Protein backbone atom coordinates (compact mmCIF):
# COMPACT_ATOMS: atom_id res chain seq x y z
CA UNK A 1 0.00 0.00 0.00
CA UNK A 2 1.24 3.48 -0.89
CA UNK A 3 0.96 6.37 1.55
CA UNK A 4 1.02 10.14 1.23
CA UNK A 5 2.57 12.39 3.88
CA UNK A 6 1.35 15.83 4.89
CA UNK A 7 3.82 18.02 6.77
CA UNK A 8 3.48 21.45 8.35
CA UNK A 9 6.08 23.52 10.19
CA UNK A 10 5.94 26.22 12.84
CA UNK A 11 9.16 28.19 13.10
CA UNK A 12 9.93 30.66 15.89
CA UNK A 13 12.48 33.41 15.26
CA UNK A 14 13.83 35.65 18.01
CA UNK A 15 13.58 39.17 16.64
CA UNK A 16 16.84 41.10 16.88
CA UNK A 17 15.84 43.95 19.20
CA UNK A 18 17.86 45.59 21.95
CA UNK A 19 15.08 45.22 24.50
CA UNK A 20 12.14 42.90 25.13
CA UNK A 21 8.74 43.17 23.51
CA UNK A 22 6.80 44.51 26.51
CA UNK A 23 9.51 45.66 28.92
CA UNK A 24 12.74 47.70 28.75
CA UNK A 25 14.85 44.73 29.89
CA UNK A 26 17.85 44.10 27.60
CA UNK A 27 18.20 41.00 25.44
CA UNK A 28 21.63 39.35 25.72
CA UNK A 29 22.33 35.70 25.02
CA UNK A 30 24.20 33.89 27.77
CA UNK A 31 23.64 36.47 30.53
CA UNK A 32 23.63 35.25 34.13
CA UNK A 33 20.23 33.86 35.14
CA UNK A 34 17.57 36.43 36.08
CA UNK A 35 19.86 39.43 35.55
CA UNK A 36 17.95 40.81 32.55
CA UNK A 37 14.48 41.09 34.05
CA UNK A 38 12.26 43.65 35.71
CA UNK A 39 8.84 43.91 37.34
CA UNK A 40 7.03 43.50 34.01
CA UNK A 41 8.86 40.24 33.30
CA UNK A 42 8.08 39.04 36.83
CA UNK A 43 4.36 39.88 36.36
CA UNK A 44 4.20 41.91 39.53
CA UNK A 45 0.67 43.11 40.39
CA UNK A 46 -0.34 46.38 38.75
CA UNK A 47 2.38 46.52 36.08
CA UNK A 48 1.39 47.06 32.44
CA UNK A 49 3.12 45.96 29.23
CA UNK A 50 4.76 48.62 27.03
CA UNK A 51 4.98 47.64 23.38
CA UNK A 52 8.38 47.79 21.68
CA UNK A 53 7.26 48.97 18.23
CA UNK A 54 10.49 47.85 16.59
CA UNK A 55 9.16 44.29 16.61
CA UNK A 56 6.58 45.36 14.04
CA UNK A 57 9.24 46.84 11.76
CA UNK A 58 11.24 43.60 11.83
CA UNK A 59 8.14 41.47 11.39
CA UNK A 60 6.98 43.53 8.40
CA UNK A 61 10.39 43.02 6.77
CA UNK A 62 9.96 39.25 6.94
CA UNK A 63 6.35 39.49 5.77
CA UNK A 64 7.38 41.49 2.71
CA UNK A 65 10.25 39.11 1.94
CA UNK A 66 7.83 36.14 1.96
CA UNK A 67 5.10 37.76 -0.18
CA UNK A 68 2.72 37.82 2.80
CA UNK A 69 -0.38 40.01 3.12
CA UNK A 70 0.08 42.41 6.04
CA UNK A 71 -3.08 43.09 7.99
CA UNK A 72 -3.88 46.81 8.39
CA UNK A 73 -5.06 46.30 11.99
CA UNK A 74 -3.56 43.74 14.36
CA UNK A 75 -4.00 43.15 18.05
CA UNK A 76 -2.60 40.98 20.80
CA UNK A 77 -4.42 38.21 22.64
CA UNK A 78 -3.94 36.21 25.81
CA UNK A 79 -3.14 32.51 25.54
CA UNK A 80 -3.99 31.09 28.95
CA UNK A 81 -1.94 28.30 30.51
CA UNK A 82 0.03 27.76 33.70
CA UNK A 83 3.68 26.76 33.83
CA UNK A 84 6.50 27.90 36.16
CA UNK A 85 8.36 29.72 33.37
CA UNK A 86 5.22 31.77 32.62
CA UNK A 87 4.64 33.99 35.69
CA UNK A 88 1.55 35.75 34.28
CA UNK A 89 -0.21 32.38 33.68
CA UNK A 90 -0.84 33.57 30.12
CA UNK A 91 1.24 34.39 27.06
CA UNK A 92 0.71 37.54 25.03
CA UNK A 93 0.44 36.48 21.39
CA UNK A 94 -1.59 37.23 18.25
CA UNK A 95 -4.41 34.79 17.59
CA UNK A 96 -7.37 36.57 16.02
CA UNK A 97 -5.58 39.32 14.05
CA UNK A 98 -1.96 38.30 13.34
CA UNK A 99 0.67 40.41 11.64
CA UNK A 100 0.36 38.76 8.22
CA UNK A 101 -1.24 35.92 6.28
CA UNK A 102 -1.16 34.11 2.94
CA UNK A 103 2.52 34.26 2.02
CA UNK A 104 4.69 31.73 0.22
CA UNK A 105 8.22 30.52 -0.39
CA UNK A 106 9.45 28.78 -3.52
CA UNK A 107 11.77 25.81 -3.04
CA UNK A 108 13.50 23.39 -5.37
CA UNK A 109 13.66 19.70 -4.51
CA UNK A 110 15.06 17.01 -6.82
CA UNK A 111 15.15 19.48 -9.69
CA UNK A 112 11.49 20.52 -9.35
CA UNK A 113 10.23 23.86 -8.07
CA UNK A 114 7.37 24.01 -5.60
CA UNK A 115 5.55 26.81 -3.80
CA UNK A 116 5.07 26.28 -0.05
CA UNK A 117 2.35 28.45 1.46
CA UNK A 118 2.67 30.46 4.66
CA UNK A 119 -0.59 30.34 6.58
CA UNK A 120 0.27 33.22 8.89
CA UNK A 121 2.98 34.90 10.91
CA UNK A 122 2.39 36.44 14.28
CA UNK A 123 4.32 38.28 16.97
CA UNK A 124 4.44 36.98 20.52
CA UNK A 125 6.53 36.91 23.67
CA UNK A 126 8.84 34.07 24.63
CA UNK A 127 8.56 32.23 27.94
CA UNK A 128 11.28 31.82 30.55
CA UNK A 129 13.41 28.72 30.88
CA UNK A 130 13.07 25.83 33.34
CA UNK A 131 16.12 23.87 34.45
CA UNK A 132 15.62 20.65 36.39
CA UNK A 133 18.41 20.03 38.89
CA UNK A 134 19.76 16.68 40.09
CA UNK A 135 18.73 17.61 43.65
CA UNK A 136 15.05 17.34 42.76
CA UNK A 137 14.54 21.10 42.50
CA UNK A 138 13.62 23.01 39.36
CA UNK A 139 15.01 26.46 38.64
CA UNK A 140 13.42 29.23 36.58
CA UNK A 141 15.40 31.78 34.56
CA UNK A 142 13.25 34.68 33.34
CA UNK A 143 15.91 36.30 31.15
CA UNK A 144 14.14 34.86 28.10
CA UNK A 145 10.67 35.85 29.36
CA UNK A 146 9.35 38.57 27.04
CA UNK A 147 11.96 38.19 24.30
CA UNK A 148 10.11 39.03 21.05
CA UNK A 149 9.32 36.14 18.72
CA UNK A 150 8.00 35.96 15.19
CA UNK A 151 6.23 32.65 14.58
CA UNK A 152 5.92 31.63 10.93
CA UNK A 153 3.26 28.95 10.38
CA UNK A 154 3.38 27.11 7.07
CA UNK A 155 0.49 25.59 5.21
CA UNK A 156 0.58 21.75 5.30
CA UNK A 157 2.01 21.76 1.76
CA UNK A 158 5.10 19.61 2.27
CA UNK A 159 4.91 15.96 1.32
CA UNK A 160 8.25 14.56 2.43
CA UNK A 161 11.17 15.39 4.75
CA UNK A 162 13.29 16.76 1.89
CA UNK A 163 10.66 19.37 1.07
CA UNK A 164 10.53 20.36 4.75
CA UNK A 165 14.32 20.65 4.81
CA UNK A 166 14.32 22.80 1.66
CA UNK A 167 11.59 25.05 3.07
CA UNK A 168 13.46 25.54 6.34
CA UNK A 169 16.71 26.29 4.54
CA UNK A 170 15.07 28.91 2.32
CA UNK A 171 13.06 30.47 5.18
CA UNK A 172 16.14 30.72 7.39
CA UNK A 173 18.06 32.35 4.55
CA UNK A 174 15.29 34.89 3.88
CA UNK A 175 14.94 35.89 7.53
CA UNK A 176 18.69 36.15 8.04
CA UNK A 177 19.18 38.38 5.00
CA UNK A 178 16.48 40.79 6.17
CA UNK A 179 18.40 41.23 9.41
CA UNK A 180 15.28 40.58 11.49
CA UNK A 181 16.90 37.67 13.37
CA UNK A 182 20.34 36.10 13.62
CA UNK A 183 18.68 32.64 13.22
CA UNK A 184 21.23 30.87 15.44
CA UNK A 185 19.65 27.53 16.33
CA UNK A 186 22.45 26.75 18.77
CA UNK A 187 21.44 29.84 20.78
CA UNK A 188 17.71 29.22 20.49
CA UNK A 189 16.99 32.18 18.22
CA UNK A 190 15.43 29.81 15.70
CA UNK A 191 13.28 26.90 16.88
CA UNK A 192 11.23 24.44 14.88
CA UNK A 193 8.05 22.50 15.65
CA UNK A 194 6.80 19.99 13.09
CA UNK A 195 3.61 18.05 12.55
CA UNK A 196 3.15 15.13 10.20
CA UNK A 197 0.30 12.84 9.23
CA UNK A 198 0.05 10.10 6.64
CA UNK A 199 -2.87 8.61 4.76
CA UNK A 200 -3.35 6.00 2.04
CA UNK A 201 -2.67 7.41 -1.42
CA UNK A 202 -5.91 8.59 -2.99
CA UNK A 203 -7.64 9.31 0.33
CA UNK A 204 -8.71 12.94 0.67
CA UNK A 205 -9.18 13.04 4.44
CA UNK A 206 -5.98 13.86 6.29
CA UNK A 207 -4.57 11.38 8.76
CA UNK A 208 -4.06 11.99 12.48
CA UNK A 209 -1.19 14.39 13.04
CA UNK A 210 1.74 13.87 15.34
CA UNK A 211 3.70 16.87 16.64
CA UNK A 212 7.39 17.15 17.42
CA UNK A 213 8.54 20.25 19.27
CA UNK A 214 11.74 22.24 19.71
CA UNK A 215 13.87 20.42 17.15
CA UNK A 216 17.25 22.12 17.37
CA UNK A 217 18.83 21.38 13.99
CA UNK A 218 17.78 20.95 10.39
CA UNK A 219 19.24 17.46 10.45
CA UNK A 220 17.00 16.55 13.39
CA UNK A 221 13.98 17.87 11.48
CA UNK A 222 14.76 15.74 8.46
CA UNK A 223 15.64 12.59 10.42
CA UNK A 224 12.68 12.81 12.80
CA UNK A 225 10.20 13.28 9.96
CA UNK A 226 11.71 10.39 8.01
CA UNK A 227 11.46 8.11 11.04
CA UNK A 228 7.94 9.24 11.86
CA UNK A 229 6.81 8.55 8.28
CA UNK A 230 7.96 4.95 8.55
CA UNK A 231 6.60 4.51 12.07
CA UNK A 232 3.12 5.71 11.16
CA UNK A 233 3.09 3.54 8.03
CA UNK A 234 3.92 0.48 10.12
CA UNK A 235 1.14 1.34 12.58
CA UNK A 236 -1.45 1.59 9.80
CA UNK A 237 -0.22 -1.51 7.96
CA UNK A 238 -0.52 -3.54 11.17
CA UNK A 239 -4.15 -2.45 11.57
CA UNK A 240 -3.53 0.09 14.33
CA UNK A 241 -4.46 3.76 14.67
CA UNK A 242 -2.07 6.68 14.87
CA UNK A 243 -2.63 8.60 18.10
CA UNK A 244 -2.93 12.37 18.28
CA UNK A 245 0.23 12.99 20.27
CA UNK A 246 3.41 14.92 20.89
CA UNK A 247 6.73 13.13 20.46
CA UNK A 248 10.37 14.08 20.84
CA UNK A 249 13.36 13.12 18.73
CA UNK A 250 16.07 11.00 20.37
CA UNK A 251 19.31 11.92 18.63
CA UNK A 252 21.17 8.86 19.93
CA UNK A 253 18.72 6.32 18.51
CA UNK A 254 17.39 8.33 15.58
CA UNK A 255 13.85 7.54 16.74
CA UNK A 256 10.92 9.57 18.03
CA UNK A 257 9.71 8.92 21.58
CA UNK A 258 6.18 9.45 22.89
CA UNK A 259 5.84 12.35 25.34
CA UNK A 260 2.10 12.64 25.73
CA UNK A 261 -1.14 11.54 24.08
CA UNK A 262 -3.66 14.30 23.36
CA UNK A 263 -7.43 13.89 23.43
CA UNK A 264 -7.89 16.93 21.21
CA UNK A 265 -6.42 20.34 20.46
CA UNK A 266 -5.71 22.29 23.64
CA UNK A 267 -8.20 24.98 24.64
CA UNK A 268 -6.17 28.02 25.65
CA UNK A 269 -9.26 30.25 26.05
CA UNK A 270 -7.87 33.00 23.85
CA UNK A 271 -9.29 36.47 24.36
CA UNK A 272 -8.11 39.97 23.35
CA UNK A 273 -5.34 41.49 25.47
CA UNK A 274 -7.07 44.39 27.30
CA UNK A 275 -3.85 46.23 28.21
CA UNK A 276 -2.55 46.74 24.65
CA UNK A 277 -4.50 48.75 22.08
CA UNK A 278 -5.00 47.42 18.52
CA UNK A 279 -2.06 48.35 16.31
CA UNK A 280 -2.77 50.12 13.01
CA UNK A 281 -0.21 49.61 10.26
CA UNK A 282 -0.21 52.38 7.65
CA UNK A 283 0.53 51.52 4.03
CA UNK A 284 2.98 54.42 3.88
CA UNK A 285 5.05 52.76 6.63
CA UNK A 286 4.97 49.42 4.81
CA UNK A 287 6.17 51.19 1.64
CA UNK A 288 8.96 52.88 3.58
CA UNK A 289 10.12 49.54 5.02
CA UNK A 290 9.90 47.91 1.58
CA UNK A 291 12.21 50.57 0.13
CA UNK A 292 14.74 49.98 2.91
CA UNK A 293 14.79 46.18 2.60
CA UNK A 294 18.32 44.82 2.10
CA UNK A 295 19.20 43.00 -1.11
CA UNK A 296 17.56 39.58 -0.96
CA UNK A 297 19.54 36.34 -1.37
CA UNK A 298 17.76 35.77 -4.69
CA UNK A 299 18.84 39.19 -5.98
CA UNK A 300 22.39 38.55 -4.83
CA UNK A 301 22.40 35.19 -6.61
CA UNK A 302 21.43 36.85 -9.88
CA UNK A 303 24.15 39.46 -9.42
CA UNK A 304 26.81 36.87 -8.64
CA UNK A 305 25.97 34.78 -11.69
CA UNK A 306 25.29 37.56 -14.22
CA UNK A 307 27.66 40.32 -13.14
CA UNK A 308 30.47 38.33 -11.55
CA UNK A 309 30.20 35.32 -13.85
CA UNK A 310 30.52 32.67 -11.14
CA UNK A 311 28.76 29.31 -11.30
CA UNK A 312 25.29 28.92 -9.80
CA UNK A 313 26.57 26.23 -7.44
CA UNK A 314 29.31 28.53 -6.12
CA UNK A 315 26.76 31.32 -5.64
CA UNK A 316 24.48 28.99 -3.67
CA UNK A 317 27.33 27.95 -1.35
CA UNK A 318 28.32 31.57 -0.72
CA UNK A 319 24.70 32.49 0.02
CA UNK A 320 24.23 29.83 2.69
CA UNK A 321 24.81 32.56 5.27
CA UNK A 322 24.61 36.34 5.11
CA UNK A 323 28.02 36.60 6.78
CA UNK A 324 29.62 34.56 4.01
CA UNK A 325 27.87 36.60 1.32
CA UNK A 326 28.89 39.90 2.92
CA UNK A 327 32.48 38.66 3.20
CA UNK A 328 32.50 37.74 -0.50
CA UNK A 329 31.05 41.10 -1.56
CA UNK A 330 33.64 42.95 0.52
CA UNK A 331 36.49 40.91 -0.99
CA UNK A 332 35.33 41.64 -4.55
CA UNK A 333 34.86 45.32 -3.67
CA UNK A 334 38.48 45.31 -2.45
CA UNK A 335 39.65 44.17 -5.88
CA UNK A 336 39.55 40.37 -5.75
CA UNK A 337 38.78 38.47 -8.94
CA UNK A 338 35.16 37.26 -8.40
CA UNK A 339 35.79 33.71 -9.60
CA UNK A 340 38.99 33.24 -7.60
CA UNK A 341 37.36 34.80 -4.53
CA UNK A 342 34.44 32.36 -4.81
CA UNK A 343 36.83 29.41 -5.14
CA UNK A 344 38.91 30.41 -2.13
CA UNK A 345 35.89 31.19 0.01
CA UNK A 346 34.07 27.95 -0.80
CA UNK A 347 37.10 25.68 -0.46
CA UNK A 348 39.86 27.05 1.77
CA UNK A 349 37.82 29.38 4.00
CA UNK A 350 34.87 27.01 4.43
CA UNK A 351 37.27 24.13 4.98
CA UNK A 352 38.89 26.03 7.84
CA UNK A 353 35.51 26.96 9.32
CA UNK A 354 34.29 23.35 9.25
CA UNK A 355 37.53 21.94 10.64
CA UNK A 356 37.60 24.39 13.54
CA UNK A 357 33.83 24.59 14.10
CA UNK A 358 33.78 28.39 13.95
CA UNK A 359 31.85 31.01 12.00
CA UNK A 360 33.27 33.43 9.47
CA UNK A 361 32.91 36.25 12.01
CA UNK A 362 35.35 34.39 14.29
CA UNK A 363 38.31 34.25 11.89
CA UNK A 364 41.12 36.80 11.65
CA UNK A 365 41.25 36.81 7.86
CA UNK A 366 39.61 39.96 6.51
CA UNK A 367 37.98 40.35 3.07
CA UNK A 368 40.71 42.87 2.24
CA UNK A 369 43.42 40.33 3.12
CA UNK A 370 41.80 37.70 0.89
CA UNK A 371 41.56 40.24 -1.94
CA UNK A 372 45.23 41.20 -1.55
CA UNK A 373 46.30 37.56 -1.66
CA UNK A 374 44.18 36.84 -4.74
CA UNK A 375 45.65 39.88 -6.52
CA UNK A 376 49.16 38.55 -5.80
CA UNK A 377 48.19 35.17 -7.25
CA UNK A 378 46.73 36.75 -10.37
CA UNK A 379 49.66 39.07 -11.09
CA UNK A 380 52.17 36.27 -10.53
CA UNK A 381 53.70 37.65 -7.33
CA UNK A 382 53.05 34.32 -5.56
CA UNK A 383 52.18 30.82 -6.70
CA UNK A 384 49.05 28.94 -5.65
CA UNK A 385 51.24 26.73 -3.48
CA UNK A 386 52.75 29.72 -1.67
CA UNK A 387 49.29 31.28 -1.43
CA UNK A 388 48.12 28.41 0.78
CA UNK A 389 50.90 29.16 3.26
CA UNK A 390 50.03 32.85 3.19
CA UNK A 391 46.34 32.02 3.66
CA UNK A 392 47.09 29.86 6.71
CA UNK A 393 49.10 32.65 8.31
CA UNK A 394 46.44 35.27 7.60
CA UNK A 395 43.43 33.25 8.75
CA UNK A 396 45.12 32.14 11.98
CA UNK A 397 46.99 35.31 12.92
CA UNK A 398 45.45 38.11 10.87
CA UNK A 399 48.78 38.83 9.17
CA UNK A 400 48.80 41.17 6.18
CA UNK A 401 49.48 38.91 3.15
CA UNK A 402 51.63 41.39 1.21
CA UNK A 403 53.86 42.19 4.17
CA UNK A 404 54.18 38.50 5.06
CA UNK A 405 55.23 37.58 1.51
CA UNK A 406 57.82 40.35 1.44
CA UNK A 407 59.20 39.61 4.92
CA UNK A 408 59.52 35.87 4.21
CA UNK A 409 61.00 36.31 0.74
CA UNK A 410 58.14 34.44 -0.90
CA UNK A 411 57.85 36.65 -3.97
CA UNK A 412 57.66 34.47 -7.06
CA UNK A 413 60.51 34.72 -9.57
CA UNK A 414 59.03 35.83 -12.90
CA UNK A 415 61.93 37.82 -14.36
CA UNK A 416 62.61 36.42 -17.85
CA UNK A 417 66.17 37.81 -17.84
CA UNK A 418 66.90 35.58 -14.82
CA UNK A 419 64.85 32.52 -15.76
CA UNK A 420 65.83 32.49 -19.46
CA UNK A 421 69.49 31.49 -18.96
CA UNK A 422 68.45 28.90 -16.37
CA UNK A 423 66.02 27.32 -18.83
CA UNK A 424 68.66 27.22 -21.57
CA UNK A 425 71.16 25.50 -19.26
CA UNK A 426 68.62 22.94 -18.00
CA UNK A 427 67.71 22.04 -21.59
CA UNK A 428 71.40 21.76 -22.52
CA UNK A 429 72.07 19.50 -19.53
CA UNK A 430 69.18 17.14 -20.31
CA UNK A 431 69.37 16.05 -23.97
CA UNK A 432 67.31 12.92 -23.28
CA UNK A 433 64.40 15.05 -22.09
CA UNK A 434 64.67 17.10 -25.28
CA UNK A 435 64.52 13.91 -27.33
CA UNK A 436 61.55 12.63 -25.30
CA UNK A 437 59.72 15.91 -25.86
CA UNK A 438 60.28 15.68 -29.62
CA UNK A 439 58.87 12.14 -29.52
CA UNK A 440 55.64 13.41 -27.95
CA UNK A 441 56.33 12.49 -24.35
CA UNK A 442 54.71 15.33 -22.43
CA UNK A 443 56.18 14.17 -19.14
CA UNK A 444 59.55 15.39 -20.30
CA UNK A 445 58.63 19.03 -19.89
CA UNK A 446 57.35 18.29 -16.39
CA UNK A 447 60.78 16.95 -15.47
CA UNK A 448 62.48 20.06 -16.81
CA UNK A 449 60.08 22.35 -14.92
CA UNK A 450 60.94 20.39 -11.79
CA UNK A 451 64.65 21.06 -12.32
CA UNK A 452 64.03 24.80 -12.54
CA UNK A 453 61.83 24.74 -9.44
CA UNK A 454 64.55 22.83 -7.60
CA UNK A 455 67.19 25.40 -8.50
CA UNK A 456 64.98 28.32 -7.45
CA UNK A 457 63.73 26.57 -4.30
CA UNK A 458 60.18 26.65 -5.60
CA UNK A 459 60.11 30.38 -6.26
CA UNK A 460 60.05 30.29 -10.06
CA UNK A 461 56.76 31.19 -11.69
CA UNK A 462 55.58 27.88 -13.23
CA UNK A 463 53.61 29.66 -15.93
CA UNK A 464 56.64 31.68 -17.08
CA UNK A 465 58.91 28.63 -16.84
CA UNK A 466 56.55 26.58 -19.01
CA UNK A 467 56.39 29.33 -21.61
CA UNK A 468 60.18 29.65 -21.75
CA UNK A 469 60.70 25.88 -21.89
CA UNK A 470 58.21 25.43 -24.72
CA UNK A 471 59.88 28.21 -26.69
CA UNK A 472 63.35 26.77 -26.05
CA UNK A 473 62.36 23.20 -26.92
CA UNK A 474 60.58 24.26 -30.10
CA UNK A 475 63.79 25.90 -31.28
CA UNK A 476 65.88 22.74 -30.88
Swiss-Prot record:
GO BP annotation list: glutaminyl-tRNAGln biosynthesis via transamidation; translation
* KW Protein biosynthesis (keyword) present: yes
Give the SUPFAM superfamilies listed for this entry.
Answer: GatB/YqeY motif, Glutamine synthetase/guanido kinase
The GO terms this record gives for MF are:
asparaginyl-tRNA synthase (glutamine-hydrolyzing) activity; ATP binding; glutaminyl-tRNA synthase (glutamine-hydrolyzing) activity
Q: Report the catalytic activity.
A: L-glutamyl-tRNA(Gln) + L-glutamine + ATP + H2O = L-glutaminyl-tRNA(Gln) + L-glutamate + ADP + phosphate + H(+); L-aspartyl-tRNA(Asn) + L-glutamine + ATP + H2O = L-asparaginyl-tRNA(Asn) + L-glutamate + ADP + phosphate + 2 H(+)
Function per UniProt: Allows the formation of correctly charged Asn-tRNA(Asn) or Gln-tRNA(Gln) through the transamidation of misacylated Asp-tRNA(Asn) or Glu-tRNA(Gln) in organisms which lack either or both of asparaginyl-tRNA or glutaminyl-tRNA synthetases. The reaction takes place in the presence of glutamine and ATP through an activated phospho-Asp-tRNA(Asn) or phospho-Glu-tRNA(Gln).
UniProt similarity note = Belongs to the GatB/GatE family. GatB subfamily.
Name-wise, this protein is Aspartyl/glutamyl-tRNA(Asn/Gln) amidotransferase subunit B
Origin species, per record, is Lactobacillus gasseri (strain ATCC 33323 / DSM 20243 / BCRC 14619 / CIP 102991 / JCM 1131 / KCTC 3163 / NCIMB 11718 / NCTC 13722 / AM63)
The beginning of the lineage is:
Bacteria, Bacillati, Bacillota, Bacilli, Lactobacillales
